[in-house]
């Protein structure tokens, strides 16, 4: 009998310190709903759910008819399951890693190298850059989700320099003057001035950074205590970041980078060399299968300042330009498609109302991973004459060209995300 080509997965949870704790975490709630044996500790963080074949989180196969223990092992022995184009383009490997993140405290400000730079960095310093792949990524909000993303318009940065003297002091008079002069000029002049300012900030002496940050925190705290609103300089966020990462250069990055608050279903796409940081909330994330990160702050980890300042994309743009809108499917009223300008991954969102009794998952020429965020269904697999019950938090691997029919077993709306590779 042929090996099943659609099967449920048990996925790896990462308990990084920045994750939401216990049942406040969407990751923990998905885990608890899908696995009756899961024990959720109310004092432990549940930061990420990894759905894929990454060596640090290869999903286990929940089908005793399959001899391989993990998805990575199974794909290695059944590479045709990827679909012919995906198999040939990505050397028989699943090209994406699919995740759920539950963020309580800010992650480091970071950027990911493009493929060319990733190869160079990996050769030079494999201890810091573990592979030669690029790492574009996309976050889709499940709850209100706050993040920093890309350089804000230069006019806004100049305004912060006027209002936050501690910030301007670290950048210095010459770099500040160059940035002010670039306003309204050509894009290249603005990007060059921005690079100069950001490099000055990142290369500031630690002692001076700590002094200026303490002065700013003291000033904002006093104003807030006196009943003044300090939101024109993001007072609340600065105090929050300083509490999480005292004395960290990254606290000043909020004056350089766009602050986005995504509503559920809204997305941001983070291409190579775009500085970003996730601050708070729950999201679905999809990325190319890589671990390469160049950090810029809000972290005790290694910061490669020269590489960072050299590689970043310094093109400023307003925050609403950073939102990535999905396309509505022409054939399926319940399907939205988030298809970023990279070959490695696409994410589909299915919102099916409770009035529908069954829903056909579209057949693709790509392996895919499906996550049940809301709802209870029975997945019917015609090719295997099999039925698989799926609850909230359930994860299903679907090989290329397999059809799946979802029968809704509890009359509640469905929210499903599916990662795939549409070449």
UniProtKB/Swiss-Prot annotation:
Modified residues (N-acetylalanine): 2
SUPFAM superfamilies for the chain: RmlC-like cupins (SSF51182)
Reactions it catalyzes: D-mannose 6-phosphate = D-fructose 6-phosphate
Cofactor binding note: Binds 1 zinc ion per subunit.
Catalytic class of the enzyme: isomerase
Location of this chain's protein in the cell: Cytoplasm
Biological or metabolic pathway of the protein: Nucleotide-sugar biosynthesis; GDP-alpha-D-mannose biosynthesis; alpha-D-mannose 1-phosphate from D-fructose 6-phosphate: step 1/2
Annotated coiled-coil segments of the chain: none
Cofactors named for this entry: Zn(2+)
A single GO cellular-component term on record: cytosol
One Pfam family this sequence matches: PMI_typeI_C
Residues at which Zn(2+) binds: 110, 112, 137, 276
PROSITE patterns associated with the record: PMI_I_1, PMI_I_2
Function: Isomerase that catalyzes the interconversion of fructose-6-P and mannose-6-P and has a critical role in the supply of D-mannose derivatives required for many eukaryotic glycosylation reactions.
NCBIfam families in the cross-refs: manA
Protein's name in the database: Mannose-6-phosphate isomerase
Lineage of producing organism: Eukaryota, Metazoa, Chordata, Craniata, Vertebrata
């Amino acid at each position: 009998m042929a090996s099943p080509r659609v099967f449920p997965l048990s996925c790896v949870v990462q308990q990084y310190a920045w994750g939401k704790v216990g049942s406040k975490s969407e990751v923990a709630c998905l885990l608890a709903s899908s696995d009756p044996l899961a024990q959720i500790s109310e004092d432990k963080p549940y930061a990420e759910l990894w759905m894929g074949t990454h060596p640090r989180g290869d999903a286990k196969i929940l089908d005793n008819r399959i001899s391989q223990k993990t998805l990575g092992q199974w794909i290695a022995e059944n590479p045709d399951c990827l679909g012919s184009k995906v198999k040939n383009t990505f050397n028989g490997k699943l090209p994406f890693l699919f995740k759920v993140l539950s963020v309580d405290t800010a992650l480091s400000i970071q950027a990911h190298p493009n493929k060319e730079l990733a190869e160079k960095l990996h050769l030079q310093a494999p201890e810091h850059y573990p592979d030669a792949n690029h790492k574009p990524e996309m976050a889709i909000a499940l709850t209100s989700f706050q993040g920093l993303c890309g350089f804000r318009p230069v006019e806004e940065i100049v305004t912060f320099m006027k209002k936050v003297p501690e910030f301007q002091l670290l950048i210095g008079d010459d770099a500040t003057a160059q940035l002010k002069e670039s306003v309204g000029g050509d894009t290249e002049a603005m990007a060059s001035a921005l690079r100069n300012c950001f490099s000055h900030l990142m290369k500031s002496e630690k002692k001076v950074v700590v002094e200026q940050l303490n002065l700013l925190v003291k000033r904002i705290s006093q104003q807030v205590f006196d009943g003044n609103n300090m939101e024109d300089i993001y007072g609340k966020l600065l105090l929050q970041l300083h509490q999480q990462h005292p004395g960290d250069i990254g606290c000043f990055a909020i004056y350089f980078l766009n602050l986005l608050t995504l509503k559920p279903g809204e997305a941001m796409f983070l291409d190579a060399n775009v500085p970003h940081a996730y601050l708070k909330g729950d999201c679905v994330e999809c990325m190319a299968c890589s671990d390469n990160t160049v950090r810029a702050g809000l972290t005790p980890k290694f910061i490669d300042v020269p590489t960072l300042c050299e590689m970043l994309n310094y093109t400023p743009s307003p925050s609403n330009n950073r939102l990535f809108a999905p396309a509505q499917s022409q054939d399926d009223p319940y399907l939205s498609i988030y298809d970023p300008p990279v070959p490695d991954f696409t994410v589909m969102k299915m919102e099916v109302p409770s009035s529908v009794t069954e829903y056909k998952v579209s057949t693709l020429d790509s392996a895919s991973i499906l996550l049940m965020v809301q709802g209870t269904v029975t997945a019917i697999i015609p090719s295997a004459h099999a039925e698989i019950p799926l609850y909230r938090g359930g994860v299903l691997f679907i090989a290329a060209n397999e059809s799946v029919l979802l029968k809704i077993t509890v009359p509640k709306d469905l929210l499903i995300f599916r990662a795939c590779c549409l070449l």
